[in-house]
Amino acid sequence: MDRGGGRPRLRVCLITEYFYPEDGGGTPAMLSELVRFLADQHPDLAVDVITSRNFYRSSGARPAPLENWDGVLIRRLSVPRSNRPSTALRLLAGLGFAAAATARLLLSHRYDLVLVGTNPPAAPAAAAALKWVRKTPYAYLVHDLYPDIAVGLGALRADGAVARFARWWQQRWLHGAARVTVLGRCMRNHLVTSYGLGEHRIEVVPNWTDVDAILPKPPQESGFRKRHGLRGFVVLYAGNIGDSQRLEDILGAAALLRDSHPQVSFVLAGDGNARDRIASQVAGRNLRNVVLLAPVPPQDYPDLLAAADASFVSLSPALDGLAVPSKFGNLLAAARPVIAVVPDASELSHVISEAECGVQVTPGEPQQLAFAVARLAEAEGLCHRMGANARRAAASRFTLRGSADQYYQLITSLARVPAGAEGRSGRPPSRHVSPGTQ
Protein backbone atom coordinates (compact mmCIF):
# COMPACT_ATOMS: atom_id res chain seq x y z
CA MET A 1 0.00 0.00 0.00
CA ASP A 2 1.28 3.47 -0.83
CA ARG A 3 0.42 7.06 -0.17
CA GLY A 4 0.49 8.13 -3.79
CA GLY A 5 3.58 8.96 -5.78
CA GLY A 6 5.09 5.63 -4.77
CA ARG A 7 5.47 6.59 -1.10
CA PRO A 8 4.40 3.94 1.44
CA ARG A 9 1.47 4.69 3.72
CA LEU A 10 2.20 5.60 7.31
CA ARG A 11 1.34 2.66 9.55
CA VAL A 12 -0.23 3.69 12.84
CA CYS A 13 -1.54 1.51 15.67
CA LEU A 14 -3.91 2.61 18.44
CA ILE A 15 -3.87 0.71 21.75
CA THR A 16 -6.96 1.05 23.94
CA GLU A 17 -9.03 -1.40 25.96
CA TYR A 18 -12.49 -0.46 24.65
CA PHE A 19 -13.27 0.34 21.04
CA TYR A 20 -15.86 -0.11 18.30
CA PRO A 21 -18.52 -1.55 18.52
CA GLU A 22 -18.52 -0.27 22.13
CA ASP A 23 -21.57 2.03 22.34
CA GLY A 24 -21.35 3.29 25.91
CA GLY A 25 -20.12 6.75 24.93
CA GLY A 26 -17.15 8.47 26.52
CA THR A 27 -13.56 7.80 25.49
CA PRO A 28 -14.22 4.52 23.57
CA ALA A 29 -16.75 6.26 21.34
CA MET A 30 -14.44 9.24 20.85
CA LEU A 31 -11.50 7.07 19.82
CA SER A 32 -13.70 5.02 17.48
CA GLU A 33 -14.94 8.20 15.80
CA LEU A 34 -11.40 9.54 15.54
CA VAL A 35 -10.00 6.41 13.91
CA ARG A 36 -12.96 6.18 11.52
CA PHE A 37 -12.49 9.81 10.49
CA LEU A 38 -8.72 9.49 9.99
CA ALA A 39 -9.11 6.31 7.94
CA ASP A 40 -11.84 7.83 5.76
CA GLN A 41 -10.26 11.24 5.23
CA HIS A 42 -6.57 10.36 4.97
CA PRO A 43 -5.72 7.53 2.56
CA ASP A 44 -2.05 8.12 3.36
CA LEU A 45 -2.64 6.48 6.76
CA ALA A 46 -3.04 2.76 7.49
CA VAL A 47 -4.61 2.53 10.94
CA ASP A 48 -4.71 -0.64 13.05
CA VAL A 49 -6.25 -1.01 16.51
CA ILE A 50 -5.31 -3.36 19.33
CA THR A 51 -8.14 -3.56 21.83
CA SER A 52 -10.04 -6.11 23.94
CA ARG A 53 -13.10 -8.20 23.16
CA ASN A 54 -14.88 -6.67 26.14
CA PHE A 55 -17.61 -4.08 26.51
CA TYR A 56 -17.33 -1.60 29.36
CA ARG A 57 -20.80 -2.08 30.84
CA SER A 58 -22.06 -5.36 29.41
CA SER A 59 -20.88 -8.94 29.26
CA GLY A 60 -22.88 -10.19 26.28
CA ALA A 61 -21.65 -11.76 23.06
CA ARG A 62 -18.10 -10.63 22.41
CA PRO A 63 -16.99 -9.33 19.01
CA ALA A 64 -14.65 -11.33 16.79
CA PRO A 65 -10.93 -11.37 17.64
CA LEU A 66 -10.08 -10.03 14.17
CA GLU A 67 -12.13 -7.60 12.09
CA ASN A 68 -11.56 -5.41 9.06
CA TRP A 69 -13.72 -2.37 9.83
CA ASP A 70 -13.85 -0.76 6.38
CA GLY A 71 -10.09 -0.63 6.10
CA VAL A 72 -9.26 -0.42 9.81
CA LEU A 73 -7.76 -3.68 11.06
CA ILE A 74 -8.97 -4.38 14.61
CA ARG A 75 -7.22 -7.04 16.68
CA ARG A 76 -9.15 -7.88 19.84
CA LEU A 77 -7.50 -9.57 22.80
CA SER A 78 -9.24 -12.14 25.00
CA VAL A 79 -8.42 -10.65 28.40
CA PRO A 80 -10.43 -9.91 31.57
CA ARG A 81 -12.15 -6.54 31.86
CA SER A 82 -10.20 -4.01 33.91
CA ASN A 83 -13.23 -2.22 35.39
CA ARG A 84 -13.36 -4.51 38.44
CA PRO A 85 -14.64 -3.49 41.89
CA SER A 86 -11.33 -4.41 43.54
CA THR A 87 -8.28 -2.19 43.06
CA ALA A 88 -6.05 -5.28 43.01
CA LEU A 89 -8.18 -6.97 40.34
CA ARG A 90 -8.23 -3.81 38.23
CA LEU A 91 -4.46 -3.59 38.45
CA LEU A 92 -3.97 -7.24 37.50
CA ALA A 93 -6.43 -7.03 34.60
CA GLY A 94 -4.77 -3.87 33.33
CA LEU A 95 -1.33 -5.46 33.46
CA GLY A 96 -2.73 -8.50 31.65
CA PHE A 97 -4.03 -6.28 28.85
CA ALA A 98 -0.69 -4.49 28.58
CA ALA A 99 1.21 -7.78 28.39
CA ALA A 100 -1.12 -9.19 25.73
CA ALA A 101 -0.95 -5.95 23.73
CA THR A 102 2.86 -6.02 23.89
CA ALA A 103 2.94 -9.57 22.52
CA ARG A 104 0.50 -8.63 19.77
CA LEU A 105 2.60 -5.60 18.79
CA LEU A 106 5.79 -7.64 18.58
CA LEU A 107 4.07 -10.22 16.37
CA SER A 108 2.67 -7.56 14.03
CA HIS A 109 4.38 -5.73 11.20
CA ARG A 110 6.38 -2.63 12.03
CA TYR A 111 4.56 0.63 12.73
CA ASP A 112 5.67 4.19 12.11
CA LEU A 113 3.87 5.42 15.22
CA VAL A 114 1.84 4.00 18.10
CA LEU A 115 -1.01 5.91 19.74
CA VAL A 116 -1.84 4.73 23.25
CA GLY A 117 -4.64 5.79 25.58
CA THR A 118 -5.05 5.70 29.34
CA ASN A 119 -7.55 2.84 29.50
CA PRO A 120 -6.39 0.72 31.17
CA PRO A 121 -3.81 2.85 32.99
CA ALA A 122 -1.12 0.24 32.27
CA ALA A 123 -1.68 0.36 28.48
CA PRO A 124 1.33 2.67 27.86
CA ALA A 125 3.60 -0.16 29.01
CA ALA A 126 2.96 -1.86 25.67
CA ALA A 127 3.93 1.22 23.67
CA ALA A 128 7.01 1.77 25.84
CA ALA A 129 8.07 -1.85 25.33
CA LEU A 130 7.78 -1.54 21.55
CA LYS A 131 9.82 1.65 21.63
CA TRP A 132 12.53 -0.15 23.62
CA VAL A 133 12.62 -3.15 21.26
CA ARG A 134 12.04 -1.52 17.86
CA LYS A 135 12.59 2.21 18.50
CA THR A 136 8.99 2.91 17.41
CA PRO A 137 7.85 6.31 18.74
CA TYR A 138 4.55 6.64 20.55
CA ALA A 139 2.11 9.43 21.30
CA TYR A 140 0.39 9.23 24.68
CA LEU A 141 -3.29 10.25 24.63
CA VAL A 142 -4.05 11.21 28.24
CA HIS A 143 -7.78 11.32 28.98
CA ASP A 144 -7.60 10.31 32.65
CA LEU A 145 -4.41 10.44 34.68
CA TYR A 146 -3.59 7.63 37.11
CA PRO A 147 -2.61 7.12 39.88
CA ASP A 148 -3.42 10.80 40.44
CA ILE A 149 -7.18 10.30 40.04
CA ALA A 150 -7.22 7.31 42.40
CA VAL A 151 -5.31 9.36 44.99
CA GLY A 152 -7.63 12.34 44.52
CA LEU A 153 -10.72 10.18 45.08
CA GLY A 154 -9.19 8.52 48.13
CA ALA A 155 -8.89 5.06 46.56
CA LEU A 156 -5.10 5.11 47.03
CA ARG A 157 -2.87 6.75 49.62
CA ALA A 158 -0.48 9.24 48.04
CA ASP A 159 2.40 7.86 50.10
CA GLY A 160 1.39 4.21 49.68
CA ALA A 161 3.52 1.68 47.83
CA VAL A 162 1.00 1.17 45.00
CA ALA A 163 0.63 4.90 44.30
CA ARG A 164 4.38 5.51 44.40
CA PHE A 165 5.04 2.52 42.11
CA ALA A 166 2.35 3.64 39.65
CA ARG A 167 3.59 7.22 39.67
CA TRP A 168 7.14 6.07 38.93
CA TRP A 169 5.92 4.21 35.85
CA GLN A 170 3.66 7.08 34.81
CA GLN A 171 6.68 9.39 34.89
CA ARG A 172 8.62 7.05 32.62
CA TRP A 173 5.75 6.66 30.15
CA LEU A 174 5.13 10.40 29.92
CA HIS A 175 8.78 11.25 29.40
CA GLY A 176 9.21 8.37 26.95
CA ALA A 177 6.44 9.62 24.68
CA ALA A 178 7.29 11.57 21.54
CA ARG A 179 4.25 13.72 22.30
CA VAL A 180 1.51 13.78 24.93
CA THR A 181 -2.03 14.96 24.22
CA VAL A 182 -4.40 16.20 26.93
CA LEU A 183 -8.00 17.44 26.93
CA GLY A 184 -7.42 20.85 28.50
CA ARG A 185 -4.95 23.47 29.63
CA CYS A 186 -5.43 22.47 33.27
CA MET A 187 -4.20 18.95 32.44
CA ARG A 188 -1.22 20.35 30.56
CA ASN A 189 -0.31 22.50 33.55
CA HIS A 190 -0.56 19.50 35.88
CA LEU A 191 1.85 17.45 33.76
CA VAL A 192 4.30 20.33 33.70
CA THR A 193 4.23 21.01 37.43
CA SER A 194 3.76 17.48 38.79
CA TYR A 195 5.72 15.40 36.29
CA GLY A 196 8.26 17.90 34.98
CA LEU A 197 7.16 17.39 31.39
CA GLY A 198 8.21 20.13 28.96
CA GLU A 199 5.25 22.21 27.82
CA HIS A 200 6.43 21.99 24.20
CA ARG A 201 5.86 18.21 24.32
CA ILE A 202 2.20 18.53 25.28
CA GLU A 203 -0.62 19.15 22.81
CA VAL A 204 -4.08 20.27 23.94
CA VAL A 205 -6.66 18.41 21.83
CA PRO A 206 -10.23 18.75 23.13
CA ASN A 207 -12.89 16.11 22.90
CA TRP A 208 -15.60 16.97 20.41
CA THR A 209 -19.33 16.94 20.00
CA ASP A 210 -21.61 16.18 17.06
CA VAL A 211 -23.21 19.54 16.27
CA ASP A 212 -25.28 17.86 13.55
CA ALA A 213 -26.83 15.36 15.97
CA ILE A 214 -27.34 17.76 18.89
CA LEU A 215 -29.43 20.60 17.49
CA PRO A 216 -30.85 23.56 19.40
CA LYS A 217 -34.59 23.51 19.98
CA PRO A 218 -36.91 25.20 22.50
CA PRO A 219 -37.35 23.34 25.81
CA GLN A 220 -41.09 23.12 25.25
CA GLU A 221 -40.50 20.94 22.17
CA SER A 222 -38.59 18.30 24.13
CA GLY A 223 -40.43 15.00 24.36
CA PHE A 224 -38.48 14.15 27.52
CA ARG A 225 -39.72 17.33 29.19
CA LYS A 226 -43.32 16.56 28.21
CA ARG A 227 -43.18 12.91 29.32
CA HIS A 228 -41.93 13.80 32.77
CA GLY A 229 -44.16 16.84 33.25
CA LEU A 230 -41.26 19.24 33.72
CA ARG A 231 -42.29 22.88 34.01
CA GLY A 232 -40.75 26.20 34.90
CA PHE A 233 -36.98 26.69 34.80
CA VAL A 234 -35.21 23.33 34.54
CA VAL A 235 -31.56 22.87 35.49
CA LEU A 236 -30.40 19.55 34.04
CA TYR A 237 -27.57 17.27 35.08
CA ALA A 238 -27.20 14.32 32.71
CA GLY A 239 -24.48 11.76 33.30
CA ASN A 240 -22.74 9.64 35.87
CA ILE A 241 -23.90 10.12 39.46
CA GLY A 242 -20.67 9.31 41.24
CA ASP A 243 -18.27 10.54 43.87
CA SER A 244 -16.31 12.77 41.50
CA GLN A 245 -19.32 14.86 40.44
CA ARG A 246 -19.98 16.74 43.72
CA LEU A 247 -23.76 16.65 43.29
CA GLU A 248 -24.16 17.59 46.95
CA ASP A 249 -23.63 21.17 45.78
CA ILE A 250 -26.73 21.00 43.60
CA LEU A 251 -28.73 19.63 46.54
CA GLY A 252 -27.56 22.53 48.70
CA ALA A 253 -28.65 25.03 46.05
CA ALA A 254 -31.99 23.26 45.69
CA ALA A 255 -32.60 23.57 49.43
CA LEU A 256 -31.89 27.31 49.27
CA LEU A 257 -34.22 27.87 46.29
CA ARG A 258 -37.01 25.46 47.23
CA ASP A 259 -39.29 28.08 48.76
CA SER A 260 -37.99 31.34 47.27
CA HIS A 261 -37.99 30.15 43.64
CA PRO A 262 -40.67 27.47 43.25
CA GLN A 263 -40.45 27.73 39.45
CA VAL A 264 -36.92 26.23 39.51
CA SER A 265 -36.40 22.47 39.42
CA PHE A 266 -33.24 20.37 39.27
CA VAL A 267 -33.30 17.20 37.17
CA LEU A 268 -30.61 14.55 37.68
CA ALA A 269 -30.76 11.98 34.87
CA GLY A 270 -28.22 9.22 35.27
CA ASP A 271 -26.86 6.37 37.32
CA GLY A 272 -23.76 5.60 39.31
CA ASN A 273 -22.32 4.55 42.65
CA ALA A 274 -23.58 7.68 44.44
CA ARG A 275 -27.15 7.58 43.17
CA ASP A 276 -28.61 5.83 46.23
CA ARG A 277 -26.86 8.29 48.55
CA ILE A 278 -28.14 11.27 46.56
CA ALA A 279 -31.67 9.83 46.49
CA SER A 280 -31.58 9.36 50.25
CA GLN A 281 -30.51 12.97 50.77
CA VAL A 282 -33.23 14.25 48.44
CA ALA A 283 -35.87 12.37 50.43
CA GLY A 284 -34.39 13.22 53.83
CA ARG A 285 -34.22 16.95 53.08
CA ASN A 286 -37.64 17.02 51.39
CA LEU A 287 -36.20 18.47 48.21
CA ARG A 288 -39.37 18.41 46.16
CA ASN A 289 -37.64 20.54 43.52
CA VAL A 290 -35.13 17.77 42.74
CA VAL A 291 -36.13 14.98 40.34
CA LEU A 292 -34.01 11.84 39.89
CA LEU A 293 -34.56 10.05 36.59
CA ALA A 294 -32.98 7.10 34.81
CA PRO A 295 -30.37 7.62 32.09
CA VAL A 296 -31.66 7.69 28.53
CA PRO A 297 -30.44 5.61 25.57
CA PRO A 298 -27.96 7.36 23.25
CA GLN A 299 -30.56 8.06 20.57
CA ASP A 300 -32.64 10.06 23.08
CA TYR A 301 -29.73 12.08 24.45
CA PRO A 302 -30.22 15.19 22.24
CA ASP A 303 -33.88 15.39 23.27
CA LEU A 304 -32.86 15.09 26.92
CA LEU A 305 -30.46 18.03 26.58
CA ALA A 306 -33.21 20.06 24.91
CA ALA A 307 -35.40 19.63 28.01
CA ALA A 308 -33.16 21.98 29.99
CA ASP A 309 -33.24 25.74 30.37
CA ALA A 310 -29.69 25.52 31.75
CA SER A 311 -27.24 22.62 31.94
CA PHE A 312 -25.15 21.65 34.94
CA VAL A 313 -21.71 20.05 35.05
CA SER A 314 -19.35 19.57 37.97
CA LEU A 315 -16.04 18.04 38.93
CA SER A 316 -14.46 17.45 42.31
CA PRO A 317 -11.58 19.85 43.11
CA ALA A 318 -9.54 16.74 43.87
CA LEU A 319 -9.61 15.99 40.12
CA ASP A 320 -8.58 19.45 38.96
CA GLY A 321 -6.00 19.05 36.22
CA LEU A 322 -6.57 15.30 36.00
CA ALA A 323 -9.63 15.09 33.74
CA VAL A 324 -12.08 17.18 31.70
CA PRO A 325 -15.77 16.12 31.65
CA SER A 326 -16.43 14.67 28.20
CA LYS A 327 -20.05 15.88 28.21
CA PHE A 328 -19.09 19.57 28.15
CA GLY A 329 -19.09 19.90 24.36
CA ASN A 330 -22.50 18.23 24.16
CA LEU A 331 -23.95 20.74 26.62
CA LEU A 332 -22.61 23.62 24.54
CA ALA A 333 -24.05 22.16 21.33
CA ALA A 334 -27.54 22.12 22.86
CA ALA A 335 -27.41 25.95 23.05
CA ARG A 336 -28.04 26.22 26.76
CA PRO A 337 -26.05 28.21 29.33
CA VAL A 338 -23.73 25.93 31.26
CA ILE A 339 -23.46 26.18 35.04
CA ALA A 340 -20.12 24.61 35.92
CA VAL A 341 -19.13 23.83 39.49
CA VAL A 342 -15.41 23.53 38.85
CA PRO A 343 -12.18 25.12 40.11
CA ASP A 344 -11.17 28.49 38.67
CA ALA A 345 -8.21 27.02 36.76
CA SER A 346 -10.16 24.23 35.06
CA GLU A 347 -10.54 24.05 31.29
CA LEU A 348 -14.31 24.47 31.63
CA SER A 349 -13.83 27.69 33.56
CA HIS A 350 -11.52 29.04 30.85
CA VAL A 351 -13.95 28.22 28.03
CA ILE A 352 -16.97 29.63 29.86
CA SER A 353 -15.13 32.89 30.48
CA GLU A 354 -13.75 33.16 26.94
CA ALA A 355 -17.01 32.27 25.17
CA GLU A 356 -19.38 33.93 27.70
CA CYS A 357 -21.54 30.82 27.56
CA GLY A 358 -22.39 30.21 31.20
CA VAL A 359 -21.39 30.60 34.81
CA GLN A 360 -18.50 29.10 36.77
CA VAL A 361 -19.17 28.40 40.45
CA THR A 362 -16.61 27.53 43.11
CA PRO A 363 -17.06 23.93 44.37
CA GLY A 364 -18.46 23.70 47.89
CA GLU A 365 -20.37 27.00 47.64
CA PRO A 366 -24.10 26.13 47.33
CA GLN A 367 -25.06 29.75 48.06
CA GLN A 368 -23.06 30.89 45.03
CA LEU A 369 -24.66 28.17 42.93
CA ALA A 370 -28.15 29.13 44.10
CA PHE A 371 -27.47 32.77 43.20
CA ALA A 372 -26.29 31.79 39.69
CA VAL A 373 -29.37 29.64 39.07
CA ALA A 374 -31.74 32.33 40.36
CA ARG A 375 -30.08 34.95 38.16
CA LEU A 376 -30.51 32.84 35.04
CA ALA A 377 -34.08 31.89 35.93
CA GLU A 378 -35.01 35.56 36.22
CA ALA A 379 -33.18 36.75 33.07
CA GLU A 380 -34.55 35.08 29.95
CA GLY A 381 -32.53 37.33 27.65
CA LEU A 382 -29.28 36.43 29.41
CA CYS A 383 -30.08 32.73 29.05
CA HIS A 384 -30.72 33.08 25.33
CA ARG A 385 -27.54 35.07 24.78
CA MET A 386 -25.37 32.61 26.72
CA GLY A 387 -27.05 29.69 24.92
CA ALA A 388 -26.28 31.18 21.52
CA ASN A 389 -22.67 31.73 22.59
CA ALA A 390 -22.49 28.12 23.77
CA ARG A 391 -23.63 26.85 20.39
CA ARG A 392 -21.06 28.99 18.59
CA ALA A 393 -18.32 27.70 20.90
CA ALA A 394 -19.31 24.10 20.18
CA ALA A 395 -19.29 24.67 16.42
CA SER A 396 -15.94 26.47 16.40
CA ARG A 397 -13.93 24.74 19.13
CA PHE A 398 -15.32 21.25 19.73
CA THR A 399 -15.65 19.50 16.36
CA LEU A 400 -14.38 16.11 15.24
CA ARG A 401 -12.76 17.64 12.17
CA GLY A 402 -10.84 20.20 14.22
CA SER A 403 -9.49 17.65 16.70
CA ALA A 404 -8.83 15.04 13.99
CA ASP A 405 -6.82 17.61 12.03
CA GLN A 406 -4.64 18.13 15.11
CA TYR A 407 -4.12 14.38 15.45
CA TYR A 408 -3.30 14.06 11.75
CA GLN A 409 -0.67 16.79 11.99
CA LEU A 410 0.73 15.14 15.10
CA ILE A 411 0.88 11.71 13.43
CA THR A 412 2.56 12.93 10.25
CA SER A 413 5.12 15.02 12.12
CA LEU A 414 6.08 12.29 14.60
CA ALA A 415 6.04 9.36 12.18
CA ARG A 416 8.56 11.11 9.98
CA VAL A 417 11.02 11.67 12.83
CA PRO A 418 13.90 9.16 12.63
CA ALA A 419 14.29 7.10 15.78
CA GLY A 420 15.96 9.21 18.45
CA ALA A 421 15.83 12.50 16.49
CA GLU A 422 13.52 14.17 18.96
CA GLY A 423 15.72 13.20 21.86
CA ARG A 424 18.70 14.93 20.30
CA SER A 425 17.03 18.33 20.05
CA GLY A 426 14.58 18.00 22.92
CA ARG A 427 11.86 19.51 20.72
CA PRO A 428 9.55 18.09 18.06
CA PRO A 429 10.14 19.25 14.49
CA SER A 430 6.82 21.04 14.27
CA ARG A 431 3.80 21.83 16.38
CA HIS A 432 0.29 22.43 15.09
CA VAL A 433 -2.39 23.83 17.37
CA SER A 434 -5.86 24.66 16.14
CA PRO A 435 -7.36 28.01 17.18
CA GLY A 436 -9.13 27.89 20.51
CA THR A 437 -7.10 25.15 22.16
CA GLN A 438 -4.60 27.41 23.86
Task: Please report, for each region that a protein language model flagged, where it lies by residue.
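A short, well-ordered alpha-helix in the C-terminal region of glycosyltransferases
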Residues: 368, 375, 382-397, 406
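Nucleotide-sugar-dependent
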Residues: 245, 290, 297-306, 311-332, ...
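Conserved donor-binding/catalytic core segment of Leloir-type glycosyltransferases
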Residues: 227-245, 251-254
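Membrane-proximal helix-turn-helix segments that form the acceptor-binding/catalytic region
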Residues: 125, 129-133, 160-182
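N-terminal subdomain of nucleotide-sugar transferases
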Residues: 1-70, 419, 429-438
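Nucleotide-activated donor-binding/catalytic signature segment of Leloir-type glycosyltransferases, i.e.
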Residues: 270, 275-302
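A short helix/loop element that forms part of the nucleotide-sugar donor recognition site in Leloir-type
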Residues: 62-67, 215-228, 425
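Carbohydrate-associated surface elements
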Residues: 53, 186, 208
